[in-house]
Design a protein with these regions (language model features):
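Hydrophobic alpha-helical bundle cores within soluble ligand-binding/oligomerization subdomains
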Residues: 2-172
Length: 172
Protein backbone atom coordinates (compact mmCIF):
# COMPACT_ATOMS: atom_id res chain seq x y z
CA UNK A 1 0.00 0.00 0.00
CA UNK A 2 1.37 3.39 -1.03
CA UNK A 3 1.79 5.96 1.73
CA UNK A 4 0.01 9.25 1.13
CA UNK A 5 -0.31 12.68 2.65
CA UNK A 6 -3.63 14.43 2.99
CA UNK A 7 -4.22 17.91 1.62
CA UNK A 8 -7.42 19.74 2.54
CA UNK A 9 -8.49 22.73 0.48
CA UNK A 10 -11.90 24.42 0.40
CA UNK A 11 -13.51 21.55 2.27
CA UNK A 12 -12.18 18.92 -0.12
CA UNK A 13 -9.62 16.26 0.75
CA UNK A 14 -6.90 15.08 -1.62
CA UNK A 15 -4.49 12.17 -1.18
CA UNK A 16 -1.00 12.76 -2.57
CA UNK A 17 1.42 9.83 -2.79
CA UNK A 18 4.74 9.78 -0.97
CA UNK A 19 7.77 8.66 -2.99
CA UNK A 20 11.32 7.87 -1.97
CA UNK A 21 14.24 9.72 -3.53
CA UNK A 22 17.66 8.46 -4.56
CA UNK A 23 19.22 9.20 -1.18
CA UNK A 24 16.27 7.89 0.83
CA UNK A 25 14.61 11.28 1.30
CA UNK A 26 10.82 11.23 1.22
CA UNK A 27 8.91 13.46 -1.15
CA UNK A 28 5.31 14.30 -1.90
CA UNK A 29 4.36 13.58 -5.51
CA UNK A 30 2.41 16.66 -6.57
CA UNK A 31 2.38 15.82 -10.29
CA UNK A 32 -1.45 15.62 -10.29
CA UNK A 33 -1.98 18.57 -7.94
CA UNK A 34 -2.96 21.16 -10.55
CA UNK A 35 -5.15 18.77 -12.54
CA UNK A 36 -7.04 17.65 -9.43
CA UNK A 37 -7.20 20.88 -7.42
CA UNK A 38 -6.40 23.74 -9.79
CA UNK A 39 -3.62 24.71 -7.38
CA UNK A 40 0.08 25.16 -8.04
CA UNK A 41 2.95 25.29 -5.56
CA UNK A 42 5.32 28.11 -4.65
CA UNK A 43 8.93 27.17 -3.90
CA UNK A 44 11.26 30.16 -4.43
CA UNK A 45 14.60 28.94 -5.75
CA UNK A 46 13.27 25.36 -5.92
CA UNK A 47 15.08 24.59 -2.67
CA UNK A 48 12.44 22.03 -1.68
CA UNK A 49 11.66 20.68 -5.12
CA UNK A 50 12.95 17.65 -6.94
CA UNK A 51 12.37 18.52 -10.58
CA UNK A 52 12.55 14.95 -11.82
CA UNK A 53 13.49 11.40 -10.93
CA UNK A 54 17.10 10.72 -11.89
CA UNK A 55 19.38 7.74 -11.65
CA UNK A 56 22.24 9.93 -12.87
CA UNK A 57 22.45 13.04 -10.71
CA UNK A 58 21.77 13.79 -7.05
CA UNK A 59 21.98 17.40 -5.88
CA UNK A 60 21.53 18.84 -2.39
CA UNK A 61 22.54 22.47 -2.67
CA UNK A 62 22.07 23.21 1.04
CA UNK A 63 24.53 20.47 1.95
CA UNK A 64 26.85 21.13 -1.01
CA UNK A 65 26.32 17.62 -2.38
CA UNK A 66 26.60 16.69 -6.05
CA UNK A 67 26.85 13.05 -7.08
CA UNK A 68 26.90 11.33 -10.44
CA UNK A 69 25.61 7.77 -10.27
CA UNK A 70 26.25 7.83 -6.52
CA UNK A 71 29.87 9.01 -6.81
CA UNK A 72 30.73 12.38 -5.20
CA UNK A 73 31.85 15.04 -7.69
CA UNK A 74 34.95 15.59 -5.54
CA UNK A 75 36.26 12.23 -6.75
CA UNK A 76 36.25 13.56 -10.30
CA UNK A 77 37.83 16.86 -9.25
CA UNK A 78 40.82 14.95 -7.87
CA UNK A 79 41.16 12.60 -10.84
CA UNK A 80 39.34 14.15 -13.80
CA UNK A 81 38.99 11.63 -16.58
CA UNK A 82 36.67 12.33 -19.48
CA UNK A 83 36.44 8.71 -20.63
CA UNK A 84 35.53 7.40 -17.16
CA UNK A 85 32.90 10.06 -16.54
CA UNK A 86 31.33 9.61 -19.98
CA UNK A 87 31.15 5.83 -19.45
CA UNK A 88 29.69 6.31 -15.96
CA UNK A 89 26.95 8.64 -17.18
CA UNK A 90 26.01 6.37 -20.10
CA UNK A 91 26.29 2.92 -18.52
CA UNK A 92 25.82 3.60 -14.80
CA UNK A 93 29.18 2.38 -13.55
CA UNK A 94 32.85 3.15 -13.94
CA UNK A 95 34.46 1.17 -16.76
CA UNK A 96 36.62 -1.91 -16.34
CA UNK A 97 40.08 -1.49 -17.86
CA UNK A 98 39.08 -3.34 -21.06
CA UNK A 99 35.94 -1.18 -21.41
CA UNK A 100 37.99 1.97 -20.77
CA UNK A 101 40.58 1.02 -23.40
CA UNK A 102 37.95 0.10 -26.01
CA UNK A 103 35.86 3.24 -25.41
CA UNK A 104 38.90 5.52 -25.34
CA UNK A 105 40.09 4.10 -28.66
CA UNK A 106 36.62 4.49 -30.18
CA UNK A 107 36.49 8.13 -29.07
CA UNK A 108 39.76 8.81 -30.85
CA UNK A 109 39.00 6.72 -33.94
CA UNK A 110 35.59 8.31 -34.60
CA UNK A 111 36.57 11.97 -34.09
CA UNK A 112 36.62 13.14 -37.72
CA UNK A 113 33.64 15.01 -39.10
CA UNK A 114 32.51 15.32 -42.71
CA UNK A 115 34.12 18.17 -44.65
CA UNK A 116 30.76 19.87 -45.20
CA UNK A 117 30.30 19.99 -41.42
CA UNK A 118 33.46 22.10 -41.28
CA UNK A 119 31.90 24.51 -43.78
CA UNK A 120 28.74 24.67 -41.65
CA UNK A 121 30.82 25.51 -38.60
CA UNK A 122 32.68 28.26 -40.43
CA UNK A 123 29.37 29.78 -41.53
CA UNK A 124 28.36 30.86 -38.04
CA UNK A 125 29.14 34.42 -36.95
CA UNK A 126 32.08 34.65 -34.57
CA UNK A 127 29.79 36.40 -32.08
CA UNK A 128 27.24 33.55 -32.07
CA UNK A 129 26.60 31.87 -28.70
CA UNK A 130 28.77 28.72 -28.44
CA UNK A 131 25.91 26.52 -27.22
CA UNK A 132 23.72 27.60 -30.13
CA UNK A 133 26.49 26.62 -32.54
CA UNK A 134 27.07 23.30 -30.80
CA UNK A 135 23.33 22.52 -30.82
CA UNK A 136 23.03 23.30 -34.53
CA UNK A 137 26.08 21.19 -35.34
CA UNK A 138 24.77 18.22 -33.33
CA UNK A 139 21.47 18.44 -35.21
CA UNK A 140 23.37 18.54 -38.51
CA UNK A 141 25.32 15.42 -37.51
CA UNK A 142 22.13 13.36 -37.71
CA UNK A 143 22.04 14.06 -41.46
CA UNK A 144 25.36 12.23 -41.83
CA UNK A 145 24.78 9.64 -39.11
CA UNK A 146 21.19 8.37 -39.07
CA UNK A 147 22.20 5.90 -36.35
CA UNK A 148 22.29 8.86 -33.92
CA UNK A 149 18.53 9.29 -34.25
CA UNK A 150 17.47 6.08 -32.57
CA UNK A 151 19.38 3.28 -30.91
CA UNK A 152 17.19 0.21 -30.49
CA UNK A 153 19.96 -2.31 -29.95
CA UNK A 154 21.67 -2.05 -26.54
CA UNK A 155 24.74 -3.68 -28.09
CA UNK A 156 25.03 -0.71 -30.47
CA UNK A 157 24.79 1.90 -27.71
CA UNK A 158 28.52 1.90 -26.95
CA UNK A 159 29.53 2.42 -30.59
CA UNK A 160 26.92 5.11 -31.24
CA UNK A 161 27.72 6.93 -27.99
CA UNK A 162 31.45 6.88 -28.77
CA UNK A 163 30.85 8.16 -32.29
CA UNK A 164 28.61 11.01 -31.12
CA UNK A 165 30.81 12.05 -28.18
CA UNK A 166 33.96 12.00 -30.29
CA UNK A 167 32.37 14.24 -32.90
CA UNK A 168 31.10 16.65 -30.24
CA UNK A 169 34.64 16.94 -28.90
CA UNK A 170 35.85 17.72 -32.43
CA UNK A 171 33.16 20.36 -32.96
CA UNK A 172 33.78 21.98 -29.59
Amino acid sequence: MTETVTLQVDGKTYQLPLVQGTEGERAIDISRLRAETGLITLDPGYGNTGSCESAITYIDGDQGILRYRGIPIEQFEKNPNFVEVAWLLIFGKLPEQSEYDRFSEALTYRANIDESMTHNLQGFPRSAPPMAILSAMINALSCFHPEFRKVDDPDELEAVAARLISKIRTIA
